[in-house]
């Protein structure tokens, strides 16, 4: 599937873009939303002009991408979700995940309805917790995980045109993950759009969006750390 890389993005973002467009329409056309009438060009969406459709599609994709930010953190720091890692340090893992969830839920509880507060608290708390766990560990586990993964995948890469058991296995779990990503993005869009629709004002909504995507920015730090460690400790030739 490496030669059809675009299929990954089509699977991952097409449905999310459609749901994102619906979310944008909901947020701007719902009288109870803080974004009601924010986009004047959508007031007469029933005309379905090319400009309106293009604008909604573009905003839908942007909303989809923002909503999917927690998935990037999960993907980058997934080494800390392995059973062997959790079993080795259960208390540290629990503290790094539960404390941010409790704090995030408590803060959101003041401004959002309970269902939205709990949903956002769990997503954002897990998001921050994994990023913090990776930083406190100085990315050691992530470095080991990616090195082991690269070593395991190397034979399959050299035989990429062959239907080897390893290639079939990798293709299978990638398909599963990408379809899972698509549905997880939809779930995150529902949570985020509900939270934004029930937010007290646009200022809080902006803060919520910043907090929602902030831990995902740590992926740049993780990538840079892996690059630096590869330069210092390259794979044997």
Where are the regions a protein language model picked out?
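N-terminal first transmembrane alpha-helix
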Residues: 1-112, 204-216, 222, 226-231
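C-terminal transmembrane-bundle signature of multipass membrane proteins
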Residues: 168-237
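Juxtamembrane/interfacial segments around transmembrane helices
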Residues: 59-70, 141-158, 226-237
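Transmembrane alpha-helical segments of multi-pass membrane proteins
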Residues: 83-106, 120-129, 170-184
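Alpha-helical membrane-embedding segments
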Residues: 71-79, 151-174, 178, 185
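Membrane-proximal helix-loop-helix units in multi-pass membrane proteins
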Residues: 97-162
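Detector for Asparagine
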Residues: 3, 37, 52, 137, ...
